[in-house]
C-alpha cells in the first residue's frame, strides 16, 4: 500500500490527466456494457413484434454508444501517454536529485550498476505498468461491477454461477501474486548483476584487450546472463499460470450458464434474447477478471520496482547541512586540526581505518603525507572536505568544526584532487569551468600553465578540444594535470592533492609544485608515494596502520622515524640500481625517486606494501 502511495505522490502535474483518464475509461466501459441490453431488446421486443422502426432506433443507439466509446478511447490514449511518461520523468528526476544529496557513505551501500538499473529498467517497468495497465486497471473493475449489475437485472438465477467462480479465481490470483512477488525482486537484482558486468567491461575494455582476457570476461557475462535468463523463466513461468486457469473458469461458467439457461427457456422462465445478452455479459465479466489478474501481475512487478526506487528516495543522507541559519558561510583561514579523530567506513566494521589522530596544520603551510598502502592517507584528507564524517573526535577547518559549515561553502574552500581522476564528456573548457563557471579564458590558461597543461593543450585541440567518454585520447598524466588545473580555478583556502601526480614525470611534478608554492595563503596537503614530491614541505606526516607515526621535516624524520627511513632507503636503493643499469630504462635512471613509475617497491619494504 505504501508503494502505491509513493507512486501516486509523484504524479504531480499529471494528476488531472490521470483523473480524466479514469473518467474516459469508466464512461466508455458503461457505454459498451449498455450495448448487450440494447441487443437483448432488439431480439426480445423488436424481432417478435416485427417493428422495424424500433429495431432501427435501437441500432442507432448502439452506433451512438460505439462512436462515443471511440472518442473516449482516443481521449484516454492521450491522457495515459502523458501520465506514464510524466510519472517516469518525475521519478527519474527525484531519484537523480536524491543521489546528488547522498554522502559517499550512503553511495557505498549501492553498486553504480544498481542505481543505473533503478533509474532506467525499474522506471521503464513502472511506465509500462501505467501505460499498458491503466486502462484495464480502470476498465476491469468497472466492467466487473456494472456487468454483474446488468447480469442480475437480466436473470438472478444465472448470476449465481459467478458466486462460485469468483472466489475460486480470487484464491488462484492471490496464490500466483504471492509466488511471483519475490521473484520479480530477484529478477531486478539479476538485472543489476548483468548491468554491473557490462558496465565494468565497457569501462575497462582497454585492460581486457591488453591482458587478452576477453574469454574470461565472456565467461563472467555468460554466468550473469544465464542467471538472468533462469530467473526470468521462473518468474514469467509462474506468472502465466493465470491464463489457463482463467480460460478454464470462463469455459466452465459459459457451459454452466448455457445448461441452466437452456432449461429456463424450455420452462418458459427466460427469453432467448435475455440468454444471448447474459452470455455477452459472461464474456465481458470473465474478460474483466482476466484484465484484473493481468493488472495485478503488472502492479506486482511495478510495485517491486517502486520499492527499489523508494529505498534510494528514503535514504537519509549521512552528511547534512546544519539546521536553520546556524551554518557558517566560509572558513576564516586554511588551518586544519584533527582532535582525537577515529574513522571507519561502516558502522559494523571491526576496526577503525583511522585511530585517534591528533594533528594540527597551520594556515598557509605545505604538508606532505606519506604511508603504506591502507595506512589511511586518503581517508584522512576526505574528512577535511567532509566527504565523510569522523566516527569519533572532531575535524576543524579555520578553527571551527567542519560539521558547522554550510556544505557547499566548505567544499568551495577545500579543493581536493581525488586519487581517481574524473573528466566529463565535453570540451576542455567545460571541464575546467567546473572549478569556476565564470572563469575567463585568461584565467583558464593561467591555471593550465600552473598545472603544466599548456605543454599538451594544443595537441588536444586547445580549450575547445573535445574530451570523449572516459577521457579517451588523454593519457593518465594529462588527465591528472587537467584535474589539478580545474581545482586551482576554485582558488580554495585548502588544496589537497591525493597522489595526484603519480602519473607525471619528476620534472613536471617539480614544476607543478613550484607553481603551487606561489599560491598565497593556501594550505597545501600533498599525498605522495615519492619522497621527492614532499621532501621540501614545511612538515611531513607519516601514517602507519591508521595512526600518526611521525611528524617533522625531511631531515627530522630521516634522523628519527624508522618507517620514513625505510621508505627513503628503499627508494634510494632502487635509484642506485637504476643508475647502475640493473634492468631499468634511462628514464628511471634519471629519476632517483621514481619508484612508482618504474615498478619498484612503492613504500619501502614488505611491511608497508
Residue map of PLM features:
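Helix-loop-helix
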Residues: 51-57, 146, 150-164, 234-308, ...
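Transmembrane helices of ABC transporter permease
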Residues: 13, 17-30, 34, 41, ...
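Pre-NBD coupling/linker segments of ABC/ABC-like ATPases
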Residues: 317-331
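Membrane-integrated ABC transporters
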Residues: 1-32, 39, 47-63, 72, ...
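Alpha-helical transmembrane segments of multi-pass membrane proteins
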Residues: 17-18, 65-84, 135-142, 163-190, ...
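ABC-type nucleotide-binding domain
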Residues: 329-609
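An intracellular "coupling" helix at the cytosolic face of ABC transporter transmembrane type-1 domains
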Residues: 13-16, 101-105, 121-130, 134, ...
Amino acid at each position: 500500500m505504501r508503494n502505491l502511495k509513493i507512486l501516486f505522490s509523484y504524479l504531480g502535474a499529471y494528476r488531472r490527466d490521470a483523473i480524466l483518464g479514469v473518467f474516459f475509461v469508466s464512461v466508455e466501459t458503461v457505454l459498451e456494457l449498455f450495448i448487450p441490453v440494447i441487443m437483448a431488446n432488439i431480439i426480445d421486443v423488436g424481432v417478435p413484434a416485427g417493428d422495424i422502426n424500433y429495431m432501427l432506433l435501437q441500432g442507432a443507439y448502439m452506433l451512438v454508444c460505439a462512436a462515443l466509446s471511440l472518442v473516449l478511447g482516443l481521449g484516454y490514449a492521450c491522457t495515459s501517454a502523458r501520465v506514464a511518461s510524466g510519472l517516469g520523468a518525475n521519478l527519474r528526476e527525484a531519484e537523480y536529485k536524491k543521489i546528488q544529496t547522498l554522502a559517499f557513505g550512503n553511495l557505498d551501500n549501492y553498486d553504480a550498476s544498481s542505481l543505473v538499473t533503478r533509474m532506467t529498467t525499474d522506471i521503464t517497468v513502472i511506465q509500462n505498468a501505467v501505460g499498458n495497465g491503466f486502462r484495464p486497471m480502470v476498465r476491469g473493475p468497472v466492467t466487473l461491477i456494472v456487468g454483474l449489475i446488468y447480469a442480475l437485472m437480466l436473470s438472478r438465477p444465472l448470476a449465481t454461477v459467478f458466486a462460485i467462480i469468483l472466489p475460486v479465481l480470487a484464491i488462484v490470483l492471490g496464490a500466483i501474486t504471492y509466488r511471483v512477488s519475490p521473484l520479480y525482486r530477484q529478477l531486478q537484482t539479476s538485472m543489476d548483476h548483468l548491468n554491473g558486468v557490462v558496465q565494468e567491461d565497457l569501462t575497462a575494455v582497454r585492460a581486457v584487450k591488453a591482458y587478452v582476457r576477453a574469454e574470461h570476461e565472456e565467461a563472467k557475462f555468460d554466468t550473469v546472463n544465464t542467471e538472468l535468463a533462469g530467473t526470468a523463466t521462473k518468474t514469467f513461468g509462474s506468472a502465466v499460470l493465470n491464463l489457463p486457469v482463467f480460460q478454464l473458469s470462463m469455459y466452465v461458467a459459459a457451459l454452466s450458464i448455457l445448461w441452466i439457461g437452456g432449461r429456463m427457456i424450455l420452462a418458459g422462465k427466460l427469453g432467448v434474447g435475455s440468454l444471448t445478452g447474459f452470455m455477452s455479459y459472461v464474456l465481458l465479466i470473465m474478460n474483466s477478471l482476466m484484465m484484473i489478474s493481468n493488472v495485478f501481475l503488472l502492479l506486482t512487478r511495478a510495485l517491486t520496482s517502486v520499492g527499489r526506487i523508494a529505498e534510494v528516495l528514503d535514504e537519509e543522507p549521512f552528511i547534512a547541512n546544519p539546521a536553520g541559519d546556524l551554518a557558517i558561510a566560509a572558513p576564516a583561514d586554511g588551518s586544519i586540526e584533527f582532535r582525537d579523530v577515529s574513522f571507519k567506513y561502516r558502522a559494523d566494521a571491526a576496526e577503525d581505518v583511522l585511530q585517534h589522530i591528533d594533528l594540527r596544520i597551520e594556515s598557509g603551510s605545505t604538508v606532505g603525507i606519506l604511508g603504506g598502502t591502507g595506512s589511511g592517507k586518503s581517508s584522512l584528507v576526505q574528512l577535511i572536505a567532509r566527504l565523510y564524517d569522523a566516527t569519533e573526535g572532531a575535524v576543524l577547518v579555520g578553527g571551527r568544526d567542519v560539521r558547522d559549515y554550510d556544505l557547499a561553502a566548505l567544499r568551495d574552500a577545500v579543493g581536493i584532487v581525488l586519487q581517481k581522476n574524473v573528466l566529463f564528456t565535453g570540451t576542455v573548457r567545460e571541464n575546467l569551468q567546473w572549478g569556476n563557471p565564470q572563469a575567463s579564458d585568461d584565467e583558464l590558461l593561467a591555471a593550465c600553465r600552473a598545472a603544466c597543461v599548456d605543454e599538451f593543450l594544443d595537441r588536444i585541440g586547445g580549450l575547445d578540444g573535445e574530451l570523449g567518454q572516459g577521457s579517451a585520447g588523454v593519457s593518465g598524466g594529462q588527465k591528472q594535470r587537467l584535474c589539478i588545473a580545474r581545482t586551482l580555478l576554485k582558488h580554495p583556502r585548502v588544496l589537497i592533492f591525493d597522489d595526484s601526480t603519480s602519473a607525471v614525470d619528476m620534472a613536471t611534478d617539480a614544476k607543478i609544485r613550484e607553481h603551487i608554492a606561489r599560491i598565497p595563503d593556501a594550505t597545501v596537503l600533498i599525498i605522495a608515494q615519492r619522497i621527492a614530491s614532499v621532501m621540501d614541505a614545511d612538515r611531513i606526516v607519516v601514517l602507519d596502520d591508521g595512526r600518526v607515526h611521525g611528524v617533522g621535516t625531511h631531515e627530522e624524520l630521516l634522523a628519527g622515524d624508522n618507517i620514513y627511513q625505510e621508505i627513503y632507503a628503499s627508494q634510494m636503493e632502487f635509484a642506485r640500481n637504476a643508475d647502475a643499469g640493473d634492468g631499468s630504462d634511462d628514464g628511471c635512471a634519471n629519476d632517483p625517486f621514481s619508484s612508482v613509475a618504474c615498478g619498484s617497491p612503492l613504500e619501502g619494504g614488505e611491511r608497508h606494501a
